[in-house]
Amino acid sequence: MSSYKYYDLIRKPIITEKTTTLSEQNKYAFYVDKFAEKLTIKKAIEEIFKVKVKKVNILNVKGKKKRFKGIIGTQINRKKAIVTLEKDHNIDFAGGIK
C-alpha cells in the first residue's frame, strides 16, 4: 500500500490531557478511518512516523446526541486507535513549538 493511502487512514492525533499522560507510557491515540483494521493501522503508523509499533487497540466511539435550536441531531461515529510503541521509540507532536 502506498504512503498516500496511509495518510487517508490516519485521520488525526488525539491530543488531550488524558492522552498526554498516556504518552508517558509510550501510548498514542489517533482517530482512524472507520473501516481500518489493526494490521493496517500498525503499518500506517510505522510508515508515517518511522517508529516501531508494539500493539494496537481499537475502540468504536458512538456519536453523542446534540441539540441545536430545538433540533436534535447526532455527532458522527468514530473509530479510535491507541497505539503502543516499542521502548526506544516516541512520537513528538509538538516538535519545534517553544
From Swiss-Prot:
One of its GO terms (biological process) is translation. GO terms for molecular function: rRNA binding; structural constituent of ribosome. InterPro entries: Nucleotide-bd_a/b_plait_sf, Ribosomal_uL23-like, Ribosomal_uL23/eL15/eS24_sf. The keyword Ribosomal protein applies. It holds the Pfam family Ribosomal_L23. One of its GO terms (cellular component) is ribonucleoprotein complex. Belongs to the universal ribosomal protein uL23 family. NCBIfam families: PRK05738.1-3 (NF004359), PRK05738.2-4 (NF004363). Part of the 50S ribosomal subunit. Contacts protein L29, and trigger factor when it is bound to the ribosome. PANTHER family: 60S RIBOSOMAL PROTEIN L23A. This is Large ribosomal subunit protein uL23. It comes from Rickettsia peacockii (strain Rustic). The gene is rplW.
